[in-house]
């Protein structure tokens, strides 16, 4: 059974058509930033293991997640090599930092907020893969379709951990707050195309 309807309901909005248009027009930047996102996702998981080193269920999930994200990183690198896409610096977008500004500074809510933000990032990744797949060539479309299941599983894992460590009413408030901020980041003009960017300014007018 597809998890996309669940993810669509969790997110506040779908990816705008203008972003899809921009991504299809600049697939090199999209692939490089996708590679970077996979590496950052693995790094985030390892950082959580280091920081919350007495939380066994978190350690187990993040260890698996980090391994999966590094495999995805390697897969994107191989795909880029086959397509002749050269490695070049691509700066981080505003998306993840914009969401992490909402994370409260004190525990235990800092962990819960971090996990909710992680759930939104994974959910948006899944939604964007699904949005792109129908428009891509066979090789890239097949690859992105293959990532849907793991991204959906990561979204579920982050959210499950948040519920393990947090108060239900507080989590509901946090989800609503992050959902509103995430929707604004996705729907508003953005200076650059990134995997999680808003609408590139050239197309936002």
Swiss-Prot record:
Pfam families the UniProt entry points to:
MiaE
- State if Oxidoreductase is listed as a keyword: yes
Catalytic activities: 2-methylsulfanyl-N(6)-dimethylallyladenosine(37) in tRNA + AH2 + O2 = N(6)-[(2E)-4-hydroxy-3-methylbut-2-en-1-yl]-2-(methylsulfanyl)adenosine(37) in tRNA + A + H2O
Can you supply a Gene Ontology BP term from the record?
tRNA modification
The answer to whether UniProt assigns keyword Oxidoreductase to this entry is yes
- Copy the pathway line from the protein's UniProt record: tRNA modification; 2-methylthio-N-6-(cis-hydroxy)isopentenyl adenosine-tRNA biosynthesis
Explain how, and how many, cofactor molecules are bound. Contains a nonheme dinuclear iron cluster.
Alphabetized UniProt keyword annotations: Iron, Metal-binding, Monooxygenase, Oxidoreductase, tRNA processing
User: What's the Enzyme Commission number for this chain?
Assistant: 1.14.99.69
User: Which amino acid positions bind Fe cation 1, per UniProt?
Assistant: 38, 69, 72
User: What highest taxon heads this organism's lineage?
Assistant: Bacteria
Task: Name the protein family.
Answer: Belongs to the MiaE family.
Q: How does it assemble?
A: Homodimer.
Q: What does this protein do?
A: Involved in specific tRNA modification. Catalyzes the oxygen-dependent hydroxylation of 2-methylthio-N-6-isopentenyl adenosine (ms2i6A) to produce 2-methylthio-N-6-(cis-hydroxy)isopentenyl adenosine (ms2io6A) at position 37 in tRNAs.
* Name of the featured protein: tRNA 2-(methylsulfanyl)-N(6)-isopentenyladenosine(37) hydroxylase
Please give the organism: Pseudomonas putida (strain ATCC 47054 / DSM 6125 / CFBP 8728 / NCIMB 11950 / KT2440)
């Amino acid at each position: 059974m597809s998890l996309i309807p669940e993810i669509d309901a969790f997110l506040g909005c779908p990816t705008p058509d203008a972003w899809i248009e921009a991504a299809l027009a600049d697939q090199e930047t999209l692939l490089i930033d996708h590679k970077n996102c996979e590496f950052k996702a693995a790094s985030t998981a390892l950082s959580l293991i280091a920081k919350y080193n007495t939380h066994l269920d978190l350690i187990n999930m993040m260890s698996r997640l980090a391994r999966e994200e590094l495999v995805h990183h390697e897969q994107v690198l191989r795909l880029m090599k086959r397509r002749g896409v050269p490695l070049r610096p691509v700066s981080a977008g505003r998306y993840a930092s914009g969401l992490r500004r909402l994370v409260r500074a004190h525990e235990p809510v800092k962990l819960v907020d971090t996990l909710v933000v992680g759930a939104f990032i994974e959910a948006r990744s899944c939604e964007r893969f699904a949005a792109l797949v129908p428009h891509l060539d066979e090789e890239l479309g097949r690859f992105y379709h293959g990532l849907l299941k793991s991204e959906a599983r990561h979204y579920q894992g982050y959210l499950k951990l948040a519920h393990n460590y947090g108060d239900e009413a507080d989590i509901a408030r946090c989800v609503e707050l992050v959902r509103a901020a995430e929707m604004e980041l996705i729907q508003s003009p953005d200076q650059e195309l990134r995997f999680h960017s808003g609408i590139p300014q050239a197309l936002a007018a």
